[in-house]
Amino acid sequence: MAAGGAGLAPAAPADPAPSVTLTGPQVKQVQEQRVPKPAWKVALDYAMDKRGTPYVWGGASERGYDCSGLMLRAYEDAGIELPRTAAEQYGAFSRKIVWKDLKPGDLVFFSNLGHVGMISKPGFMVHSPHTGDVVKEERLSQWRRQAFVGAVRPDPKGVKRWADYTALRKAPAPAMLTATL
């Protein structure tokens, strides 16, 4: 019996966990298995990368963007199809988001659906404001709060709704028969 003890021997030290070293193709394989970014993050990264690009009315390219053209291309980069105008973008998603629940990637609409931006972080949005300006990140001012109409969170559920609508718009119009007497 050990002095002062209850007759128990000290526990043997645990073996350290084995280490694994990856080389060459193994490293590449692990890198390729990374978790993909969520769609909102891909879209937000796209929009933020376009900061400094000029506003061009009707624009949706590297030459320039209007507000809805920027959102269209940002979410297109994330694999989500949006309609062209701000009003159509707002109407394409049934789930509306209120001001207090805004998150990065949400599309925010202002001025009777005449303008759209994307939440970049709490209290800020990235957007293409108007002629003579550039794509930029900007604080959501009190004026914006007062002009706020609503917001949407583009997601796969909304995409299906928009895809159905788009398919209907592309369907051929029924033939109209006319008779002459």
Where in this protein do the model-derived segments appear?
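A generic structural-conservation signal
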Residues: 20-26, 57, 84
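Catalytic cysteine-centered active-site loop
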Residues: 50-103
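...with weaker cross-activation on analogous glycine-rich loops/strands in unrelated enzymes
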Residues: 80-141
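N-terminal hydrophobic or amphipathic helices/low-complexity stretches enriched
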Residues: 28-47
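Aromatic- and glycine-rich peptidoglycan recognition patches
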Residues: 1-20, 28-32, 96-97, 120-181
